[in-house]
């Protein structure tokens, strides 16, 4: 029972379901979610499995840091052994690759690149100032392009991917501020460790402003109408408030920023629904 619970925790089902939803939104914005349900389903499933595998292998490599930052996670508390977590991640990655192989060539290439990124993130990039954050930001933004590419229209998710990447970079920096003590003890050179938490939070705020500036582009270029603009405003406001909140409470700030990201993504669905 405890092992099963630990495996579920390693996958982080809320995060993986959210990633799958973002892939679906990419396919939907591209106009192919209804017309190509099999491809959309395969892309969503591949995203879910790959994200779950990435979370599991991240916890495998992060197990010593988690003994300080988060001792209640599955590996530090003994619910799942390190070897078990590694094997679990391999099974999830194989499943993701099998589903991705059924998709168009560009989608397969994106999936292969993302799987490579997930495998190298914790071991090689997490401790490098900004590099790990940039990779996670790319992975977050690419879910939309992957969904769009799965139905044959990769460019349709471009602006949404840019908005997601900018805001995800900001959120990852805030999370590093939250984990500052454990990362410093583990010898990781994250951005807050190198430049200090105040400067790191200022960097995250700049990226949030960049995401806010990108949000009206679909309206300005005529892709979506004014209903999209109305729908995206709450998400932008929440993200800006989150950036400010992170200065006093990084944990609350990054959670609020995630909600703002989801609201902004939902605005693209609204834009597609009301666009002739």
UniProtKB/Swiss-Prot annotation:
GO terms for molecular function: geranylgeranylglycerol-phosphate geranylgeranyltransferase activity; magnesium ion binding. One of its GO terms (biological process) is glycerophospholipid biosynthetic process. Keywords: Cell membrane, Lipid biosynthesis, Lipid metabolism, Magnesium, Membrane, Phospholipid biosynthesis, Phospholipid metabolism, Transferase, Transmembrane, Transmembrane helix. InterPro entries: DGGGP_synth, Prenyltransferase_related, UbiA_prenyltransferase, UbiA_sf. The keyword ATP-binding does not apply. Its main location: membrane. Its cofactor is Mg(2+). It comes from the Archaea. It is a multi-pass membrane protein. Pfam families: UbiA. It is an enzyme of class 2 (transferase). It is found in: Cell membrane. The keyword Nucleus does not apply. It catalyses: sn-3-O-(geranylgeranyl)glycerol 1-phosphate + (2E,6E,10E)-geranylgeranyl diphosphate = 2,3-bis-O-(geranylgeranyl)-sn-glycerol 1-phosphate + diphosphate. Belongs to the UbiA prenyltransferase family. DGGGP synthase subfamily. This is Digeranylgeranylglyceryl phosphate synthase. It comes from Halobacterium salinarum (strain ATCC 700922 / JCM 11081 / NRC-1). The lineage of its organism: Archaea, Methanobacteriati, Methanobacteriota, Stenosarchaea group, Halobacteria.
